[in-house]
Amino acid sequence: MKPVTLYDVAEYAGVSYQTVSRVVNQASHVSAKTREKVEAAMAELNYIPNRVAQQLAGKQSLLIGVATSSLALHAPSQIVAAIKSRADQLGASVVVSMVERSGVEACKAAVHNLLAQRVSGLIINYPLDDQDAIAVEAACTNVPALFLDVSDQTPINSIIFSHEDGTRLGVEHLVALGHQQIALLAGPLSSVSARLRLAGWHKYLTRNQIQPIAEREGDWSAMSGFQQTMQMLNEGIVPTAMLVANDQMALGAMRAITESGLRVGADISVVGYDDTEDSSCYIPPLTTIKQDFRLLGQTSVDRLLQLSQGQAVKGNQLLPVSLVKRKTTLAPNTQTASPRALADSLMQLARQVSRLESGQ
């Protein structure tokens, strides 16, 4: 179907092309009656303004560019959705460029793509070390930029959740339940967020005189959580609890626990990180560290608008996190396993012994 043009709107409303253009670009010298007539025609014809063309014409509406990690991951997709929701409330538009490869050069390429579309400001949700973040900020030229996945020590404009509080809450929850045999499942250590969470866990476990019995590294995906946890269990390492760096990997870990004949919560407690929308629907529902992505989206758009107007205080802004207690964490050894669960566990042990005897 042929897209509706300004000429179509002008003909339908009985006005000139120039008049429709002035209405679309919110020019002041148009009568209220004429504006209403043109807007009614636009609504009737379902006319969609060309935002890039409006920018080229000098219209001062805000066009926000978002450079983001893969939207196949739950957290980045929810953050982008929250940014779009807030931008829509303010009458702004959003254009997204996904960073397809790893590394600072790929992030710069995404930024250059957005700058070519004449964005008014940039939100960068991609993990960057301090020097890389500074280099990306320099590539933004004179366009204000806000970073969402950097260290709170990076000397740039950023909004991040408190990794310190998030890791402390997870450790304190398990310690309060009585856990001592705790395994860690980190995200990819190329990610600053993954490293900060791992460091935080170590800090607060050490304060409680606990050494993790195992450390594994995933890639944020559920499959990596499954594979890393299954490998750990097959090696005979069975913790009473796991701290996992995001909810998707926690889902995979829960599958591995269940397929190994163990029970999530009763045998191995699991604490996730993020509180993505699906976490309450896991079986059992996941105990996790909540990062409020809706709040992050709203705050980042508001602050970027302030930065573009020279009003915002520059520097780092920390957002709060909280512990959401659900059904995947229990005190260790508080429930008696069912005969079926015991049988499954014995079969798993027999398989492990058989592999050892055969030299596999």
UniProtKB/Swiss-Prot annotation:
> What domain of life is recorded for the organism?
Bacteria
Alphabetically sorted, this entry's keywords are: DNA-binding, Repressor, Transcription, Transcription regulation
Swapping Y282D leads to an effect described as: In T41 mutant
Annotated GO molecular function terms are: cis-regulatory region sequence-specific DNA binding; DNA-binding transcription factor activity; DNA-binding transcription repressor activity; identical protein binding; transcription cis-regulatory region binding
Segments of the chain annotated as binding DNA: 6-25
Recorded GO CC terms: cytosol
Which Gene Ontology biological process is one annotated for this entry? negative regulation of DNA-templated transcription
Every HTH lacI-type domain range: 1-58
Question: CDD domains recorded for this chain?
Answer: HTH_LacI, PBP1_repressor_sugar_binding-like
The subunit structure is: Homotetramer.
Function (record text): Repressor of the lactose operon. Binds allolactose as an inducer.
Q: Anything else the record notes?
A: Removing residues 1-59 results in loss of DNA-binding activity but retains tetrameric structure and inducer-binding activity. Deleting residues 340-360 results in loss of tetramer formation, but retains dimer formation, inducer-binding activity, and DNA-binding activity (if residues 1-59 are present).
**Protein name, per record:** Lactose operon repressor
> From what organism does this protein derive?
Escherichia coli (strain K12)
The major lineage groups are: Bacteria, Pseudomonadati, Pseudomonadota, Gammaproteobacteria, Enterobacterales
Gene from which the chain derives: lacI
